[in-house]
């Protein structure tokens, strides 16, 4: 590969990303993963720390129906604030799923996990017996 696209949240956070980057022999580019402003803070921090001029798609949180903060981090003229945002109780309550939606998404995740080979699950540290089915 010519470059590695790094998405902080799916890779396990800043510490995990740092360990991964150390092992790479190609330049990295940071990209978002549909994060709220709370999660975006970690991606922004990591991008600024490891590859400040190599970012793309960090504003995908704008695509979410709601954010976990009252004042979301949004880009302005191609720039984005590094200011940390903490989740707010009212915003989290507004974003919470009904029990029916929780059950729907849990079932979707379980169905998807059933398609993942057990050797891959093992490499993620997921015991085979913990997967439904």
Report each predicted region and the residues it spans.
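Flexible C-terminal active-site loop/helix
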Residues: 33-133
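Charged alpha-helix within mobile-element recombinases
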Residues: 25-29, 43
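Active-site-adjacent beta->alpha loops and helix N-cap segments on the catalytic face
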Residues: 11-25, 39
């Amino acid at each position: 590969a010519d470059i590695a696209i790094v998405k902080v949240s799916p890779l396990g956070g800043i510490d995990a990303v740092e360990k991964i980057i150390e092992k790479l022999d190609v330049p990295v580019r940071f990209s978002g993963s549909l994060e709220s402003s709370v999660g975006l803070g970690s991606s922004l921090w990591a991008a600024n720390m490891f590859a400040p001029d190599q970012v793309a798609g960090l504003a995908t949180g704008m695509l979410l129906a709601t954010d976990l903060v009252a004042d979301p981090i949004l880009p302005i003229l191609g720039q984005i604030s590094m200011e940390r945002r903490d989740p707010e109780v009212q915003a989290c309550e507004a974003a919470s799923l009904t029990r029916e939606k929780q059950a729907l998404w849990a079932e979707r995740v379980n169905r998807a996990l059933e398609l993942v080979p057990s050797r891959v699950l093992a490499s993620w540290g997921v015991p085979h017996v913990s997967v439904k089915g």
